[in-house]
From Swiss-Prot:
Name the UniProt record assigns to this protein: Disintegrin lebein-1-beta
Organism of provenance: Macrovipera lebetinus
Gene Ontology terms for molecular function: toxin activity
Miscellaneous section: Negative results: does not interact with the collagen-binding alpha-1/beta-1 (ITGA1/ITGB1) and alpha-2/beta-1 (ITGA2/ITGB1) integrins.
Sequence similarity: Belongs to the disintegrin family. Dimeric disintegrin subfamily.
Assembly behavior: Heterodimer with subunit alpha; disulfide-linked.
């Protein structure tokens, strides 16, 4: 994706020194801080939080 400043246009991977290209826990090419809400609670489900080591938003396996 040549329009994404985080993406190396040749490899489509994060540019050198950057952690990520996209996903809910990626902000300005870096992983978001652990504990940042990446998916708000709905119904009886709980919030999902970034881990600080990945750009993915892991699902919280617990219910309220």
């Amino acid at each position: 994706n040549s329009g994404n400043p985080c993406c190396d246009p040749v490899t489509c991977k994060p540019r050198r020194g950057w952690h990520c290209v996209s996903n809910p826990c990626c902000d300005n090419c870096k992983f978001m801080r652990a504990g940042t809400i990446c998916n708000r609670a709905r119904g009886d489900d709980m919030n999902d939080y970034c881990t600080g080591i990945s750009s993915d938003c892991p699902r919280n396996p617990y219910k309220d």
